[in-house]
Each structure stands twice: as structure tokens, then as C-alpha cells.
Amino acid sequence: MHDLSEKLIRFLETGDVPEGLFRPDVFLDLTMPTWRVQAASAEDLIAERKQGHPGPGRVTRWRADPTPSGFVFEFEERWNSEGQSWYAREMLRIEVTDGTIAELTVYCTGDWDHARQAEHAAAVTLIRP
């Protein structure tokens, strides 16, 4: 789990796909606040990620918890695009087969631009950031 988590972070931060991260026939089910998309290959999953997050970013916080068939991966990420800093928080349910990711179900908060982050910071004090 830890090795796959590290490989996944590398992919999320750089867009580079470490060897052995995804099965060629990996299934993606991505849910965003107002949309849902799916992909049925590593090539399509990678294209979907790069379309939504084309540049490098940083995973600023993450956690992985094992399940009987894989693990749950929670993370926060930040990146710069369109002249501003963006933020998203996501939860992934990952199914692993033969040491590689076979299925990835993603729930995303959506991409928060600078204005949304400022609005949230002014309105809400998080107990556990």
C-alpha cells in the first residue's frame, strides 16, 4: 500500500506515471460536484487527469487506509493555473490486483480557485484543517 501510495503521489504531482501504478485496463469512476465521468484504460485515465490538472502540483496532505481488496486514499492538493493558486480535496477507493491499481473511484470537492478559498476561510474556522 505504501509503495502504491508513493507512486500515486508522484503521478498526482508530476503527471508522470511510475511503472506498475495502473493496470492497462484500469477502471476510473470520477465524481465531481456537478459531473461524473468514467474511463476504462490507463491511457484514458491519464488523459482525464491531465485535462483537469495539466500542470505540476503538490499533494499537501494525504492518508491511506487498507481495505480487504486495496486501500482508501484521502488527499489534498494545490497547484497554480490561470495565474492563481487552486485547491482540491479528494477521496479515492482503490482496488488493487497483482500489486497495481485495477479500479479507482474518485470523489472530488471540485477545484477551488483563490476566491472560493478566501470565501471559505472568511466563513468557516476548521477544527481540524
For each of these PLM feature ranges, what is it?
Residues 1-25:
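Short acidic-aromatic low-complexity motifs
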Residues 6-9, 18-19, 43-47, 121-124:
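Generic detector of well-ordered alpha-helical segments enriched in charged/polar residues
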Residues 10, 14, 30-32, 94, ...:
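Generic detector of low-complexity/intrinsically disordered segments
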Residues 17-68:
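A solvent-exposed, acidic/Ser-Thr-rich amphipathic alpha-helical stretch
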Residues 47-129:
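A beta-strand edge to alpha-helix "cap/lid" segment located at domain peripheries
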